[in-house]
Swiss-Prot record:
Residues 242-532 are annotated as: Catalytic. It comes from the Bacteria. NCBIfam families: thrS. It is found in: Cytoplasm. The keyword NAD does not apply. Homodimer. SUPFAM superfamilies: Class II aaRS ABD-related (SSF52954), Class II aaRS and biotin synthetases (SSF55681), TGS-like (SSF81271), ThrRS/AlaRS common domain (SSF55186). This is Threonine--tRNA ligase. It catalyses: tRNA(Thr) + L-threonine + ATP = L-threonyl-tRNA(Thr) + AMP + diphosphate + H(+).
Length: 635
């Protein structure tokens, strides 16, 4: 008999060799029906996996991220199966699950069209009804290559040949279709209830511009049609909120072919940016942080010492100065460490909290660039904290509370993920255990719920990631807290303890916005361009009905500016209805309309973007109202 520990801590005994699907049935027939995959000792596996030793088990459904991923991974295979049925000459490349669905890359001597997608989708629906079992099998390297050569699948042959010697080579078969795949997958194609093919794109083989351009088909999959309908509605809403479209319409930023991935901020965009950065500085000063600034370009030797050269080189830009090799910084931490090393520190100085709005450059493939969300140059709102091991819990709790304050201000819900040691990492098992437990204890002490993301930590330490949920249900990873024992070791950082001896500090890397540019993009989409008054580039649009109100309009404008209210005037010879509509399209929070009645009464007619016509009030009353709104940062 073997002992299986369930997620809730319950221990059950079963015969050795039992399949996970049978365990799911014994736990609950309802769970068996919903089950898509499972985690055994943290590793995601098929439900048909047999268990031969004591293990921890979590049954995954569509409510779990890896449950969704597994279902959508199977969706990608069903897409490939449908394409091969309809167009047998097409060659298969790769087809993974992604955050919101899946894709598959194909080589074809024709161009896929939207009409073809409809045919392919209809074929997928047939495959769902056929309810093929997904059967995993393994082959020795030579047999695997032979199988793929017989099927004329050149890309699969290349993938197999690139696998290390001794690597398990596995395939999945569903009906008349077989694909090279590590898995896992759902038990049968009938588990995928609703599929939608979404779009077409080009993609270079292996993401390398030197390789052949393939055709990529994107799709998504759900267990219920109602979930698919909800998702499709979200996509339509997202199109309306696209920050690239709104950024252009609202004159916030632009991106030019002279600098792909390098955004240009316009005056109105700079207002939003400066407000976010000023608020960031104010809150960090209150929380005991000291701001620093470090250079953009630093000697190559620094990046060898930090480990970035070994772990991050392909994402970096380089230059040569005075016959020496330099790198443009992809991260702020090594420069911040040099600031710490510049002085001797006592235990009385700790914790030391150094913050930096530092510009970093990271190479992204051109196909991955996306407005402000994925760029090559951005400002990271970093902070690096240095502390003793005894201070870890208290400092992490303080950071979490600060992050919570920021996200609540902007109206975001969020969830937290604790990411543990990746395969490509530095440091001892003991340090990783202390660091990971430190983060766990901080989260547990304030009752913060979190998920564990095994193996997704930074190469130098475990981390807590904060995922924002926007108003249409999408998630964005922004803030992060990373505990680091490695950098202090590599840079020989120290402080003088109470015993007069040198000790090694613990270092924490931390962001809130993540990337300022990306956060602005998220806010544009969160608010659909209609920023709250305190953040709006233009807070008031002042407009006259005829030229006779011009002098009064200028007095009102002056009074607003004296009170630091951002105002624009519209004195064009246009109908007032046209001016109002334009201001509404520009998402201005308030419009003040001045006619002869307002001039005579010394009032302003107020129209709110949110509440419509508010009637005529005194200018003083309006100024007091809007100043309170700005001061309280009302959403």
């Amino acid at each position: 008999m073997i002992k299986i520990t369930l997620k809730d801590g319950k221990v059950m005994e079963f015969e050795e060799g039992i399949k996970i699907s049978d365990i799911a049935m014994k736990i609950s027939p309802a769970l068996y029906k919903k089950a898509l995959a499972a985690k055994i000792d943290g590793e995601t596996v098929d439900l048909m996996t047999e268990l031969h030793k004591d293990s921890s088990l979590e049954i995954l459904t569509f409510e779990d991220e890896m449950g969704k991923w597994t279902l959508r991974h199977t969706g990608s295979h069903m897409l490939a199966q449908a394409v091969k049925r309809l167009y047998p000459e097409v060659k298969l490349a790769i087809g993974p699950a992604i955050d919101t669905g899946f894709y598959y890359d194909f080589e074809a001597d024709f161009t896929f069209t939207p009409e073809m997608l409809e045919k392919i989708e209809a074929e997928i629906k047939k495959i769902i009804k056929e309810n093929h079992k997904l059967e995993r099998f393994e082959l020795p390297r030579e047999e695997a290559i032979k199988l793929m050569k017989e099927k004329n699948e050149d890309y699969k042959v290349e993938l197999i040949e690139d696998l290390p010697e001794g690597e398990v080579i596995s395939f999945y078969k569903q009906g008349d279709f077989t694909d090279l795949c590590a898995g896992p997958h759902v038990p049968s194609t009938g588990k995928v209830k609703s599929v939608k093919l979404l779009s077409l794109a080009g993609a270079y083989w292996r993401g390398d511009e030197k390789n052949k351009m393939l055709q990529r088909i994107y799709g998504t999959a759900f267990t219920k049609k109602s979930e698919l309908d909800e998702y499709l509605n979200m996509i339509e809403e997202a199109k309306k909120r696209d920050h690239r479209k709104l950024g252009k319409e609202l004159d916030l930023f632009s991106i030019h072919e002279e600098g792909p991935g390098f955004p240009f901020f316009h005056p109105k965009g700079m207002i939003v940016r400066n407000i976010l950065e000023s608020f960031w500085r104010e809150e960090h000063t209150k929380a005991g942080y000291q701001e620093i600034r470090t250079p953009l370009i630093l000697n190559e030797a620094l990046w060898h010492q930090s480990g970035h050269w070994d772990h991050y080189k392909e994402n970096m830009y380089f230059t040569n100065i005075d016959d020496g090799d330099y790198a443009i910084k992809p991260m702020n931490c090594p420069g911040g460490i040099l600031v710490y090393k510049n002085s001797m520190h006592s235990y009385r100085d700790l914790p030391l909290r150094l913050s930096e709005l530092g510009i970093v450059h990271r190479h992204e493939l051109s196909g991955a660039l996306h407005g402000l969300m994925r760029v090559r140059c951005f400002t990271q709102d970093d902070a690096h904290l240095y502390m003793t091991k005894e201070q870890i819990k208290e400092e992490i709790v303080g950071i979490i509370k600060l992050i919570d304050k920021f996200y609540k201000l902007f109206g975001f819900e969020y969830f937290v993920e604790l990411s543990t040691r990746p395969e490509d990492s530095m440091g001892s098992d003991e340090d990783w255990e202390i660091a990971t437990n430190g983060l766990r204890e901080a989260l547990d002490s304030i009752g913060k719920e979190y998920r564990v993301n095994e193996g997704d930590g930074a190469f130098y330490g475990p981390k807590i990631d904060f995922h924002l949920k926007d108003c249409i249900g999408r998630t964005w990873q922004c803030g992060t807290i990373q505990l680091d024992f490695q950098m202090p070791e590599r840079f020989d950082l120290s402080y003088i303890g109470a015993d007069g001896e040198k000790h090694r500090p613990v270092m924490v890397h931390r962001t809130i916005y993540g990337s300022v540019e990306r956060f602005i993009g998220i806010l544009i989409e969160q608010y659909a361009g209609a920023f709250p008054t305190w953040l709006a580039p233009v807070q008031v649009k002042l407009m006259n009905i005829t030229d006779s109100q011009y002098d009064y309009l200028k007095k009102v404008e002056e009074a607003l500016k004296e009170n630091n209210i951002r105002v624009e005037i519209d004195t064009r010879n246009e109908k007032i209805g046209y001016k109002i509509r334009e201001a509404q399209l520009q998402k201005v929070p308030y419009m003040l309309i001045l006619g002869d009645k307002e001039v005579e009464a010394g009032k302003v007619a107020v129209r709110s973007r949110k509440d419509g016509d508010l009637g005529a009030i005194s200018l003083e009353e309006f100024i007091e109202k809007i100043k309170n709104e700005i001061k309280n940062k009302t959403n």
